[in-house]
């Protein structure tokens, strides 16, 4: 079983990316379940998409992964990567960009964070950041 979560801000394409990943896995014969948590996405809020893939013969019962069970989080924005960390397993991988997009439509003060500092903090906590 492989669990991948894609975290981003509304409009970045996290739902589309999850659909593409799911279709690719299905084309290879994997059983796939997907789920999205969209919230205030239309206003620049967070979006979390989950793709759970079972190799041939492996049954995927639930579309939502348990916290601490995701193999890889693909973050389209560093702050959303940090928000998704409770889902990442201990030996999981976080893929995160070096620059951020502040969702100022929701919270004007959100622009006041340093993405590089946030990434350094995650690395210092032992998170495998790519």
Regions found by a protein language model. Give the residues of each.
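Active-site cofactor/cluster-binding pocket
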Residues: 1-130
């Amino acid at each position: 079983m492989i669990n991948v979560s894609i975290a981003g801000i509304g409009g970045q394409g996290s739902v589309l990316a999850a659909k593409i990943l799911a279709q690719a896995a299905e084309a290879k014969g994997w059983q796939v379940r997907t789920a999205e948590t969209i919230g205030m996405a239309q206003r620049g809020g967070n979006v979390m998409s989950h793709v759970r893939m079972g190799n041939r013969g492996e049954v995927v019962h639930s579309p939502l992964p348990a916290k601490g069970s995701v193999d890889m989080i693909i973050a389209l924005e560093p702050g959303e990567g940090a928000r998704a960390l409770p889902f990442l397993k201990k030996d999981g991988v976080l893929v995160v960009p070096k620059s951020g997009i502040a969702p100022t439509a929701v919270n004007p003060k959100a622009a006041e964070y340093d993405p590089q500092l946030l990434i350094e903090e995650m690395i210092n906590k032992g998170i495998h950041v790519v």
